[in-house]
A protein has these predicted regions:
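Long, low-complexity, charge-biased intrinsically disordered regions
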Residues: 1-224
Length: 224
């Protein structure tokens, strides 16, 4: 089951172990959903609203629809490929800056009742969006991308006389490249990200994409 992916985000402190003085204990919940393509998803989500607000900011990368449209226009203008993908369990790629404890519930099977320390950016924690953003921003910089000034969640780099772009919406990516497959393979092989639904853009951020008979890319934002 997919919820087992989150179990590696905890440090087991043993049954009945007390949390340090001044720390709160929270619960986590298993949330089940069905994706637009029929895939089933289970996610372990923490009661982060019960924790204190982090001293640094909370942030998630959320490209605007306007920025996405401009990026797609540039792709068509320069005859570049337009791909999209979803990074599986993205938050769990980053470590959390918060120190949060929880008491394991029945979903943890034989560890029910144990005290667990969360050390990964679990969904629901206040700082998880920022930690994932920082993690993936480091990845893009390492590959040679820089954030654009007017749309910081669109990243760009010059390659062979053309500009390539990556639009980030939390863990959903749209990218415009001469060779999109190579970029996806770098994310998988070098950085070990788990990509899902990778390929020519057809559905992204609630929008359907298709090409007319003359090859024109059309965007229908009826679900945005």
């Amino acid at each position: 089951m997919s919820q087992l992916d989150e179990y590696g985000t905890f440090i087991d402190l043993g049954k009945g172990e007390k949390t340090p003085k001044g720390y709160k204990k929270i619960k986590v919940h298993l949330i089940f959903d069905v994706k637009h393509d029929g895939r089933h998803k289970a996610r372990c989500v923490a009661d982060g609203h019960l924790t204190d607000i982090p001293v640094d900011s909370v942030y998630s990368g959320v490209v605007s629809l306007r920025g996405l449209r401009i990026m797609l226009f540039l792709a068509e203008l320069n005859q570049l490929e337009t791909w999209a993908t979803d990074i599986g369990n993205a938050y769990l790629e980053a470590e959390t800056s918060e120190r949060v404890y929880l008491i394991a519930g029945p979903e943890f099977n034989e560890r029910e009742g144990y005290t667990l320390l969360i050390f990964k950016a679990l969904y629901g924690l206040r700082s998880s969006g920022l930690r994932w953003h920082e993690k993936f921003a480091d990845t893009l910089r390492d590959i040679g991308f820089s954030p654009s000034k007017n749309e910081p969640d669109i990243w760009m780099r010059e390659a062979n006389g053309l500009w390539e772009y990556v639009a980030v919406y939390v863990d959903d990516l749209a990218f415009v490249m001469k060779d999109s497959k190579s970029f996806a393979n770098i994310l998988i092989q070098k950085y070990k990200y788990k990509l899902k639904g990778t390929g020519n853009i057809s559905f992204h951020l609630g929008c359907d994409f298709f090409r007319e008979e003359d090859g024109t890319l059309c965007m229908v934002p009826h679900k945005y």
